[in-house]
């Protein structure tokens, strides 16, 4: 399970970076290479539940990149890189999207200070709202997971 979570976290990071995210066939299900580093195994089309979940995550992340222009075109501000937490803010005009990744096997509560003004942080997957107080929020991040939020002005 942790391997699939690591791949999902990597791809969440990947879609938040400038340029076009690249995935090779099979990466969306965690397919490993074979032989020389550039070679791939034959593609499998019957996949298990973990592989299906990873593929669904890749699809959702691609949808987020389409929906939130800041992810592809925005300026990036690295907010946090302490320990297992990585947080970055992508800003494109008035659209601000926060990505936070927990790379540990434990749930982490962390305080994030945003370099912009806003009233609410809203989770893009479930619309959970968190008040921003003095440009800061306290977030609980599940183990080996990532979360995208948008900043509501």
Question: Which stretches of residues belong to each language-model region?
Answer:
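Extracellular ligand-binding/catalytic regions of CAZymes and related secreted enzymes
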Residues: 56-67, 86, 112, 124, ...
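Alpha-amylase-like alpha-glycosidases and glucanotransferases acting on alpha-linked glucans and related
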Residues: 1-18, 81-83
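Aromatic- and carboxylate-lined catalytic core of secreted/periplasmic carbohydrate-active enzymes
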Residues: 44-79
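Hydrophobic, well-ordered secondary-structure elements that form the walls
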Residues: 14, 26, 61, 100-102, ...
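C-terminal beta-strand-rich structural cap/linker in extracellular carbohydrate-active enzymes
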Residues: 133-153
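Aromatic/acidic polysaccharide-binding cleft in carbohydrate-active enzymes
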Residues: 11-51
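Solvent-exposed beta-hairpin/edge-strand motifs
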Residues: 113-127
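Carbohydrate-binding surface patches
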Residues: 79-115
């Amino acid at each position: 399970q942790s391997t699939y979570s690591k791949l999902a976290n990597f791809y969440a990071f990947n879609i938040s970076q400038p340029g076009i995210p690249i995935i090779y066939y099979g990466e969306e299900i965690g397919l490993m290479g074979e032989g020389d580093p550039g070679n791939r195994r034959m593609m499998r089309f019957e996949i298990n539940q973990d592989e299906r979940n990873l593929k669904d995550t890749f699809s959702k992340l691609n949808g987020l990149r389409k929906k939130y222009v800041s992810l592809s075109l925005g300026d990036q501000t690295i907010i946090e890189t302490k320990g297992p937490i990585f947080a970055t803010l992508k800003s494109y005009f008035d659209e601000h999207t926060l990505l936070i990744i927990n790379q540990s096997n434990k749930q982490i509560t962390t305080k994030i200070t945003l370099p912009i003004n806003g009233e609410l942080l809203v989770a893009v997957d479930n619309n959970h709202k968190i008040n921003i107080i003095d440009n800061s929020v306290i977030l609980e991040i599940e183990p080996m997971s990532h979360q995208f939020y948008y900043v509501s002005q």
